[in-house]
C-alpha cells in the first residue's frame, strides 16, 4: 500500500511531484448527477495559487485544471456537465519549474525537509523542489476539495489564518468578511497590517515563519462519525496532519481545554427548535464521542516555518560528510498562508466521506436532524447534492 489515497467512500488519490510535468488527483466515489465544471474547481485553485503577492513564492503557476474523466454532458442533461459516478480524474500541469535551483543540493540533505527520510525509506529521492514532499502537492487536494463541496449541500466551510509566528489575531476583532481583503486570509484587519510589516522583515532576512490556521464548517448535520475507530475528529486530525509542514492539530478548544474546569468545558444544552437541543457553547468544536453534534465543526492546525531559507545551516551529504546548506529557489516565507484553502479542502473531503458513510450505515437522517434545505443523506438517485435531469 503506497498511502497516496485517503477516504473510504469518497476516496481521493493524489499524484505528481513539484517539478514533474504535472500533478493531479483521482476522486472515486463521488455520487452521479452532480453538476460539475472546471470553472468551479479553478475558483478554489485560484485561492491557493502561488505568486499572487510578495508574501508567497514567486513561482508563477496558473494551476489550470483539466477534467479528464467522470463527467458527461449532452442534450439529455440540458447541456449541463454532470458527474457520472465513475472516477473523476483531474490534472494540473507544472509550467514554471526551475530545477537548476536545486542542483547544489542533489547530494545534500536540507535540515527540516524530508530529503533524508525519503531517501532512507525509498533509497531514492526527487531533490527538485522536494518532489512529492513539496507544498505543491496540495494543489491536487484543493481540486478534490472543490468536488467534495458539491457533496455537501447546506454546509459552509471557511478558513482563516489566526496566527503568524508569535503574532495572533485579536478574537474580539474576528470578522470573516475581512478574510478576502488581505493577502493572509486574516480575519483581523489590524493584525493583517502588522503581519505585512513583520513578514517583509522576515523576507529581507531570508527566513520564514510558521502559522496557525482555523477551519470552520457550519451546517454540518448531527450524527456524522462512528465510534470508536471511525471518529469524525480522528479522521479530521489525520487529514490535516497529512498536509505537508503541519505539526499539530486541535479540535474545538483543543489543548486549551486542559486548563479548564469541568463546568467550564461542558457544552450545556437547552431545549431547541424541532426537537433538537440548543447548545450554549461549543468548546467541543462540534464533535462529541467522535460524532458531529450539529454545531459548527472547528479545527485548527499548526504549520511549521518553511525550512527553505537563506540562513546557512549545518547538515550532511549523502555519504555522511559535514556541510552547510542554504536553500536557493523560490519559496514561501510563510507557507501557512496558502495552507488556508488546503485546510478547507481537507475538511470538505472528510465531511463528504462521512456523509456517504453515514448514509451507507444508517440511511436517511432522523427527522429534523439536518438543516432545512440540506440533503446530507441523499434522498434521490443522484445522491447528496445531485441533479436529477428531466
From Swiss-Prot:
Leading EC class: lyase
Binding annotation for NADP(+): 48, 54
Region of interest (Disordered), residue spans: 362-390
Protein's pathway: Metabolic intermediate biosynthesis; chorismate biosynthesis; chorismate from D-erythrose 4-phosphate and phosphoenolpyruvate: step 7/7
UniProt keyword list: Amino-acid biosynthesis, Aromatic amino acid biosynthesis, FAD, Flavoprotein, FMN, Lyase, NADP
Gene Ontology biological process terms from the UniProt entry: amino acid biosynthetic process; aromatic amino acid family biosynthetic process; chorismate biosynthetic process
Domain of life: Bacteria
Pfam families, alphabetized: Chorismate_synt
GO function terms (MF aspect): chorismate synthase activity; FMN binding
Cofactor(s) listed: FMNH2
EC number(s) stated in the UniProt entry for this protein: 4.2.3.5
Binding residues for FMN: 132-134, 244-245, 289, 304-308, 330
Gene3D superfamilies associated with the record: Chorismate synthase AroC (3.60.150.10)
Entry note: cofactor: Reduced FMN (FMNH(2)).
Catalysed reaction, written as an equation: 5-O-(1-carboxyvinyl)-3-phosphoshikimate = chorismate + phosphate
Keyword Flavoprotein: yes
Comp. bias intervals (Low complexity): 363-379
Gly residues composition bias: residue spans: 380-390
Gene Ontology CC: one annotated term: cytosol
Function: This reaction introduces a second double bond into the aromatic ring system.
Subunit structure of this chain's protein: Homotetramer.
Family named by the database record: Belongs to the chorismate synthase family.
Name of this protein: Chorismate synthase
Provenance organism: Methylobacterium sp. (strain 4-46)
Protein's gene: aroC
Amino acid at each position: 500500500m503506497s498511502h497516496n489515497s485517503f477516504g473510504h467512500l469518497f476516496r481521493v488519490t493524489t499524484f505528481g511531484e513539484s517539478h514533474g510535468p504535472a500533478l493531479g488527483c483521482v476522486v472515486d466515489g463521488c455520487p452521479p448527477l452532480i453538476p460539475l465544471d472546471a470553472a468551479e474547481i479553478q475558483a478554489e485553485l485560484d485561492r491557493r495559487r502561488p505568486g499572487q503577492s510578495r508574501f508567497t513564492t514567486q513561482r508563477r503557476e496558473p494551476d489550470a485544471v483539466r477534467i479528464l474523466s467522470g463527467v458527461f454532458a449532452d442534450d439529455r442533461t440540458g447541456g449541463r456537465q454532470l458527474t457520472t459516478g465513475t472516477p473523476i480524474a483531474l490534472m494540473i500541469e507544472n509550467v514554471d519549474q526551475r530545477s537548476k535551483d536545486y542542483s547544489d543540493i542533489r547530494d545534500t540533505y536540507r535540515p527540516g525537509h524530508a530529503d533524508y527520510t525519503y531517501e532512507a525509506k525509498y533509497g531514492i529521492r526527487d531533490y527538485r523542489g522536494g518532489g512529492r514532499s513539496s507544498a505543491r502537492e496540495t494543489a491536487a487536494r484543493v481540486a478534490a476539495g472543490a468536488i467534495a463541496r458539491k457533496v455537501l449541500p447546506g454546509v459552509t466551510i471557511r478558513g482563516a489564518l489566526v496566527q503568524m509566528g508569535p503574532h495572533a489575531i485579536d478574537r474580539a476583532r474576528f470578522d470573516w468578511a475581512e478574510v478576502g481583503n488581505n493577502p493572509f486570509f486574516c480575519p483581523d484587519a489590524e493584525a493583517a497590517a502588522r503581519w505585512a510589516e513583520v513578514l517583509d522583515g522576515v523576507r529581507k532576512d531570508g527566513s520564514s515563519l510558521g502559522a496557525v490556521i482555523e477551519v470552520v464548517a457550519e451546517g454540518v448535520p448531527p450524527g456524522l462519525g462512528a465510534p470508536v475507530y471511525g471518529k469524525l475528529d480522528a479522521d479530521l486530525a489525520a487529514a490535516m496532519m497529512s498536509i505537508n509542514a503541519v505539526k499539530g492539530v486541535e479540535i474545538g478548544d483543543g489543548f486549551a481545554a486542559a486548563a479548564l474546569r469541568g463546568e467550564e468545558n461542558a457544552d450545556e444544552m437547552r431545549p431547541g427548535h424541532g426537537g433538537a437541543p440548543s447548545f450554549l457553547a461549543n468548546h467541543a468544536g462540534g464533535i462529541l464521542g467522535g460524532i458531529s453534534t450539529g454545531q459548527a465543526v472547528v479545527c485548527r492546525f499548526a504549520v511549521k516555518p518553511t525550512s527553505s531559507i537563506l540562513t546557512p545551516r549545518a547538515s550532511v551529504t549523502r555519504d555522511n560528510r559535514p556541510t552547510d546548506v542554504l536553500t536557493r529557489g523560490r519559496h514561501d516565507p510563510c507557507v501557512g498562508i496558502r495552507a488556508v484553502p488546503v485546510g478547507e479542502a481537507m475538511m470538505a473531503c472528510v465531511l463528504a466521506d462521512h456523509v456517504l458513510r453515514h448514509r451507507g450505515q444508517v440511511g436517511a437522517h432522523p427527522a429534523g436532524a439536518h438543516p432545512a434545505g440540506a440533503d446530507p443523506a441523499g434522498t434521490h438517485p443522484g445522491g447528496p447534492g445531485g441533479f436529477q435531469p428531466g
